[in-house]
């Protein structure tokens, strides 16, 4: 087990006390909001640190009693009974704190941009992309997050060829960041008379929603084109040019949005562009920092097949962690907590293993 960073623990306690004092002093509203946010992040960590320090102190007192030859028999028996319990509690607290004290991903608390694109499989792939979007939409609802569709291209038989949405809420990215990759479905299409199982796929990308301070986009680096927005069957949804296409010249990235309001389109397209550029920079930093990373979960390779949804067998399998659940009907309805939590736990275990190796 990796050693606990004692200096970091003391620094967190000191910072927590400083925030408490500043909040009590009645700062300006905007300052108070920032302090309250940091306070809520630090509170569970500092509580665990204090529980740990208390347990260490209890163990030291019990050991002193046992070492003292003048301790009477009843007290000695009580100390011998309590010490193993306290030592077990210390080990559990150490495990909890190692996870809490792992280096934080700066984007974890952000909202997210969700992009789903139908892959191989034609109409069935578009239907599956629609199923995935509804799965994430329902999962978001259970968390109290807000989902807003930025753009969507519907499939001919339903579902989506492509759909892009924002999911707004605290910590969205931390929960959904491991959903990026190729999702595969195996099922019998409704139009399949012979009952033959078809395999199709959809690609999911989850990007942290970037703010202006995260990415600077210079006006001279973008080209904005307007065109007529069209709905299903190519019908014009309004008589004015409203669809917007923004091209980021240095990277060649192209983002489109086709709501009725041109002003909204530009804002939404810039929102997606900013997040994609931020994600590119994050991917670059991550690959440089952990070229030898062992954790398959954290690789972020969006061409990688990460999960299979097998409808005839009622199972969903995440290939990165070899986890199979036989409750596909509930998973596809948005009950993905077990998958999400298992992926996060696996990633944290990989981080802890690396930390332990670095300390050897």
Swiss-Prot record:
Region of interest (Disordered), ranges: 284-304
A GO molecular function held by the record? translation release factor activity, codon specific
Q: Which GO terms describe its cellular component?
A: cytoplasm
Where is the protein localized? Cytoplasm
Which family does the similarity line name? Belongs to the prokaryotic/mitochondrial release factor family.
Q: What does this protein do?
A: Peptide chain release factor 1 directs the termination of translation in response to the peptide chain termination codons UAG and UAA.
Q: What is this protein called?
A: Peptide chain release factor 1
What organism is recorded for this protein?
Answer: Agrobacterium fabrum (strain C58 / ATCC 33970) (Agrobacterium tumefaciens (strain C58))
């Amino acid at each position: 087990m990796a050693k606990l960073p004692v200096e970091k623990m003391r620094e967190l306690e000191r910072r927590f006390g400083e925030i408490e004092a500043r909040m009590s002093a009645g700062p300006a509203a905007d300052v108070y909001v920032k302090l309250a946010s940091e306070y809520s992040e630090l509170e569970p960590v500092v509580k665990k640190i204090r529980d740990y320090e208390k347990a260490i102190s209890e163990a030291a007192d019990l050991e002193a009693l046992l070492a003292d030859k003048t301790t009477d028999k009843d007290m000695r028996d009580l100390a011998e009974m309590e010490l193993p319990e306290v030592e077990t509690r210390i080990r559990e607290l150490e495990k909890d704190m190692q996870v809490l004290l792992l280096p934080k991903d700066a984007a974890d608390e952000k909202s997210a941009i969700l992009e789903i694109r139908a892959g191989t499989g034609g109409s069935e792939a578009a239907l599956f992309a629609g199923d995935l979007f509804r799965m994430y939409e329902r999962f978001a609802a259970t968390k109290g997050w807000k989902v807003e569709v930025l753009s969507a291209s519907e499939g001919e038989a339903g579902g989506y060829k492509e759909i892009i949405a924002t999911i707004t809420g605290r910590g969205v990215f931390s929960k959904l960041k491991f959903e990026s990759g190729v999702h595969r479905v195996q099922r019998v299409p409704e139009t399949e008379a012979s009952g033959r199982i078809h395999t199709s796929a959809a690609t999911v990308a989850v990007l942290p929603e970037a703010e202006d301070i995260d990415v600077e986009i210079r006006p001279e680096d973008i080209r904005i084109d307007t065109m007529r927005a069209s709905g299903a069957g190519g019908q014009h949804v309004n008589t004015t040019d409203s669809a917007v296409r923004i091209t980021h010249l240095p990277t060649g990235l192209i983002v489109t949005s086709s709501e009725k309001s041109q002003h909204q389109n530009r804002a939404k397209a810039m929102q997606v562009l900013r997040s994609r550029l931020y994600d590119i920079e994050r991917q670059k930093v991550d690959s440089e920092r952990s070229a030898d990373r062992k954790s398959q979960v954290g690789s972020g390779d969006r061409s990688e097949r990460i999960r299979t949804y097998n409808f005839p067998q009622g199972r969903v399998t995440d290939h990165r962690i070899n986890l199979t659940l036989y409750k596909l009907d509930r998973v596809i309805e948005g009950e993905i907590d077990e998958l999400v939590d298992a992926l996060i736990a696996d990633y944290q275990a990989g981080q802890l293993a690396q930390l332990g190796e670095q300390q050897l």
